[in-house]
Swiss-Prot record:
This is Protein ST7 homolog. It comes from Caenorhabditis briggsae. InterPro entries: ST7. Keywords: Coiled coil, Membrane, Transmembrane, Transmembrane helix. It is a multi-pass membrane protein. Its main location: membrane. Pfam families: ST7.
Amino acid sequence: MACSWTFLWLLWIAMVAVLLFFLRGPLKISESLESVSATSYFNNLTPKFYVALTGTSSLVSGIILIFEWWYFKNNAGVEQGEDEGSDNEESIDNPKTVPECKVWRNPMALFRAAEYNRFRKETNSEPLTYYDMNLSAQDHQSLFMCDEDQGRAEYEIMQVAWRERESEQRIQTARTALAINSECASALVLLAEEDTETVAQAENVLRRALRAIENTLSTYSNNQIASYGQNGDTVRKRDLTIQTYIKRRLAMCARKQGRLREAIKGFRDLSREQSLSTLLSVQDNLIEACLEVQAYADVQNLLVRYDGYGTSCSYDQREPRSAAMSYTSALLKVRAVAENFRCPSESSVRRGLSSAEQTAIEALTRAMEFNPHVPPYLLEIRAMIMPPEHFLKRGDSEALAYAFFHIQHWKRIDGALQLLSIVWKDFVPKVNKDTHAFSSQLESADKELLPAWHEQSAFPQTESTLGMLIQTFACLAICILAVLSQQVPSSYGEMLRQIVTSGVQMYENSMNTFSQWAPNNIIPYLASKPVSVPEI
C-alpha cells in the first residue's frame, strides 16, 4: 500500500510540474518573477488570497482523505489476511484449500422425455450436453447395477442400455429387457425417464416399477430389518436403492402436479433413511417443497438439521454446503425485514440499518461470496435456461439449478428481490474470491456441463489498483481543466493549442530519434517472411 501511495504522490507532483510548464506562457510566470520581487509580491497579497488558499488546501485534504478511506475499505481485509498468513504460515497450515471441481448430481433434475425433450422440440436446441448425460449414465450404472447381475439376462442387457449414447437405442434395449422379465424395475425406470411425453405418464410407469421392486424385495427373508448400510446381500442393497430412487421420483411427480402434501410426506419418509437420503440429496427436494407451501418454520428446522443454520457453532466461519442452503438461509432472514425494502428506493439504507436488517444483508453477502452467479438469474438480469442434470458447486451450473426452482419463492416475498438488488449492486465492486477458495478450473469445467449456445456467467472481477489510479487522475485532470476554463477563458484555447502542438512535436522528435538508429527498411523487413536460401 505504501508503494501505491508513493507512486500516487510522485505522479501528482509530476502532473503539477507538467501543468506549470505548459502554462508558463499564458500565466506569464517568468515575467511575474522577473518584474516583482518576493517581498513586494507577498506584501501585496490580500486577505481574500489567504481565504482561498485555506479553502483550496482543505479541499485537497478532503479529496486525499476520501481516496484513502476508499482504498482501505476495498483492500484492508485482503492485506490483513496476507499479513496474518505470512506471520503464521510456519506454525499453522492454511485451512482454506482450493477444492477440486467435483461434479454433483442435481437432486431437482427434470425428466428427459417429459421436460427436456419438449424443450428441444420447441426450440430445436439441445438442453443437455453429452458429458452431462454420460455422467447420468454412470450414476445409473452405479445405483442400479451390481456384480451379482452376471448371468441374469435382463440385467446384462440393462448394463448395455445405460451405456448407449442415443436415446432411441436405450429405449429399444430397455424394451428388450422387459420382454425377458416384465418385472425389471431398472428397465421401467429408464422408460419412465425417456419414453413418456408427460409427467403423469412418467408417474404411471414409475408406480409400475415400484410395484415390481416391492415384489422383488418381498421375496427376501428378513426384509423388515433390511436397510441400506448393513452388512447384507449386495443385490438386496441394490434393490433398496432402486426403491428409494423410484419413491423420490414419484414424490417429484406429485410436486410437479401440485400435490404438495403428498410430495412433502414422500420426501419426509425418504429423509428418515440417512444414508440413502444423503446419497440422493433428498433434503434439497424437501426444502423446496416446504418453501412452496410457505412452511418457513419447517424450512428453518431442516436447515438446522442439515446445515447448522442458527446454531451457535462456527457456522459463520465455515464454507456453506451448497448454494441452496446458503441462499435459503438468507431468504429466511430477508423475509423478516423485506417489508422495509418493498420500495425500490434506498431510503431504508439511508435511515440506518437495524440489527435484523444487518443480519439479513450479511447473510446475502455470505451467500454471494459462495456463489455470485445466482443473483443475476433471480433478478432476471441474465436469461435462464433449463438446469443441467449435474452441477459444480460455486459455478454457473449450480446457480441455474437453484434459480430455476427457487425464483418463485423470492418473488413471493415482497421486498426480497429489492433488498437482493441493493446488496448485489454494492457487492460487485467489492467482490473477493479469497473469502472462500475458488478453483481456477471451475469456469472451464462448467462449459462441459452447459450447452454451447448458453452465455456462461463469469465470476465478477474486482477493479484493479491501476484502473482506480487512472480514474482518479482523470477526474482530477478534468477538475483542473474546468477551473482553468472558468478562470482564464481567453487563454484556455491558446493553452489547448499549445498542448496539442507540444504533443505533436514530442511525437515527431521521438520518431526522428528512432529513425536515426533504426534502418529505413526495418518495417518491411519485420513484416516480410524469411526466405530459405537453397544450398549450392
